[in-house]
Amino acid sequence: MNESNIPAALYDVVRRDLKPVRSLVSPERRALALLPVGIALLVGLPEFWSWKSHVVLAPWSSWGTSVVEMLLSLVILAAGFREAVPGRELHNRALTVLLCVSAATFIAVNATMRSPFGISPAHWLRWLRECVVTAVTFSIPALIAPAWLVSRALPNRPGVAGALCGLGVGLMADAGLRLFCWDGDYAHVLVAHGGAILILVALGALSATLIERIKSRVRRIGATDHG
């Protein structure tokens, strides 16, 4: 079939559907582009809380381990962006290794900061609420950019890609959170700081899944209109 015998209506539909595309930047470069977000959470969270409540921040020696945690978050974001590209999905073994490394790093960097005195029962719930709310509030805007980058790549498993992005942003937030909440007991760190990360993982998975469903519905409506 050549152009001369293609039905005019079909030809117009195909021509309208053709749009120039731009190749995706590599997952690593897209993750690196979010370095300013990581720095903003690393510095902004403790500085905001110090300004708000006049708390003493962690010693400068502790900032190095937070930088390590923030750099790991970029690796996880790169994995999430790769997961979002059809045909480049991560194997289950790679996902397992990534999750284990993330958990081990979170436990290790926070193990160096716990207070020998712990938290009194009267303050436990208040500190829990403050840490979770602060981390999630600062991180939700930071999650917008990764969610948008995932949506551009047409993921086959949007929940997995979104969860990895949520994990990456959650570790970014914890890198800053631990610099002003550094004198709590280990149970507080695991429940409050770890809980904030899990909330962001869930939000990342949910947002990516919803975005793909909305895109799919829009495509169906567009196809129906053309038909």
PLM region descriptions:
Residues M1-A31:
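N-terminal juxtamembrane cytosolic/stromal segments of multi-pass membrane proteins
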Residues P27-A122:
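Selected alpha-helical membrane-embedding segments in polytopic membrane proteins
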Residues R30-G38, T134-V136, G162-L167:
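Select subsegments of transmembrane alpha-helices in polytopic membrane proteins
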Residues L57-G64, S120-V133, V160-A161, Y186-A196:
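Non-cytosolic membrane-interface motifs at loop->transmembrane helix junctions
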Residues V68-F81, V136-P146, I197-L210:
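Hydrophobic cores of alpha-helical transmembrane segments in multi-pass inner/ER membrane proteins
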Residues F106-G162:
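Membrane-proximal helix-loop-helix units in multi-pass membrane proteins
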Residues W148-G227:
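Terminal transmembrane helical module of multi-pass membrane proteins
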